[in-house]
Amino acid sequence: MKRAILIVLDGVGIGELPDAFKYNDEGSNTLVNTAKVVGGLNLPNMGKMGLSNIEEIPGIPKEEDPIALYGKMAEASPGKDSTTGHWEIAGLILEKPFPVYPNGFPKEIIEAFEKAIGRKVIGNKPASGTEIIKELGEYHMKTGYPIVYTSADSVFQIAAHEDVIPVEELYRMCEIARAMLQGDHAVARVIARPFAGSPGNFYRTPRRRDFSLPPFKPTLLDYLKQNDYDVIGVGKIEDLFAGKGLTSSFHQENNTEGINNIFKAWEKLREGLIFVNLVDFDMLYGHRNDPQGMTRALKEFDDALPDVMGLLSDFDLLIITADHGNDPTTPSTDHSREYVPLLVYSPNFKRTFSLGIRKTFSDLGKTLAEFFEVENDLCGESFLNEIEKGWKGS
């Protein structure tokens, strides 16, 4: 019986990539910089796995004898968004980045969208989601015009107050936008951003929904599903892969619920993969430049790790990584172009060591494909032989 849990800590990077300067991300290091600002991180369980052996993190001692294999992965695809990162983890490397709109969307797109939904829109610029509802929320409530905005990522976001545009209607607008945004304007994600509250006290509700492009070729998820493995998505995995390759999904409103869903998914798993995204690190703390919140979220996850590890039998795998960085200590409120940590744990490891710096996130997808013994056409280089060395102790 082959089983694996793959957990993506959304936005939890571990140092700038060599090309970070192209993205204005020099100096970004989500984990290390957060630790410096808060006076050190207390993450004993990830510490035991070798987190500080990847790069020394204030507050987390290096382990002489870590319980996991450890390393870091570089992103080969251009970009630094969740879709690009998750697709690359699952074995797809993008040759060109998804389109971005630093000056807002072209007039022809906005006019076509307005015609299709029968309403004017407001905004049409890059913005922080919390800031733009502060700025335009009251006007939106008076007019009923949805707020369209983007970010440094390839996203077309639509914000609407739940009392003005019901959530189901907002989702319908997103489906219209998704159908329109193809070809040269094929953004990675259209995102519904419902909010509530009153002027001066607006807040985003948990009913966000992503409408992603489907992957352009089969991913690890598809190959596993085709071979009758369970592929269970937890969190926004279903959204990021447009539902492709999954046998079932669990959604959640926060990391606490997401961690609980790992246990629910495990009860359902016969043989196969649980693919988890925990988004609070990114959504609540990275984008809002809140290193204290990031610290609390990391501690909550770390506290849950022993129970997650306790699920595993001898040759099961638990893998912890990220999809990009989102350094809460920099002036930017956007994602950062960073290496991501790689921690690989199995209860039966007799020896552990460094996996080094992987050239692409796809090494992880390729490794899991080989672990599950499925023929595939994925990018990347498998390191299953290293995992097997850990089991053999050789």
Swiss-Prot record:
Binds 2 manganese ions. It catalyses: 2-deoxy-alpha-D-ribose 1-phosphate = 2-deoxy-D-ribose 5-phosphate; alpha-D-ribose 1-phosphate = D-ribose 5-phosphate. Keywords: Cytoplasm, Isomerase, Manganese, Metal-binding. Mn(2+) 1 binds at D10, D323, H324. Its cofactor is Mn(2+). InterPro entries: Alkaline_phosphatase_core_sf, DeoB, Metalloenzyme, Phosphopentomutase_DeoB_cap_sf. It comes from the Bacteria. One of its GO terms (biological process) is nucleotide metabolic process. One of its GO terms (cellular component) is cytosol. Pathway: Carbohydrate degradation; 2-deoxy-D-ribose 1-phosphate degradation; D-glyceraldehyde 3-phosphate and acetaldehyde from 2-deoxy-alpha-D-ribose 1-phosphate: step 1/2. Belongs to the phosphopentomutase family. This is Phosphopentomutase. It comes from Dictyoglomus turgidum (strain DSM 6724 / Z-1310). The lineage of its organism: Bacteria, Pseudomonadati, Dictyoglomota, Dictyoglomia, Dictyoglomales. The gene is deoB.
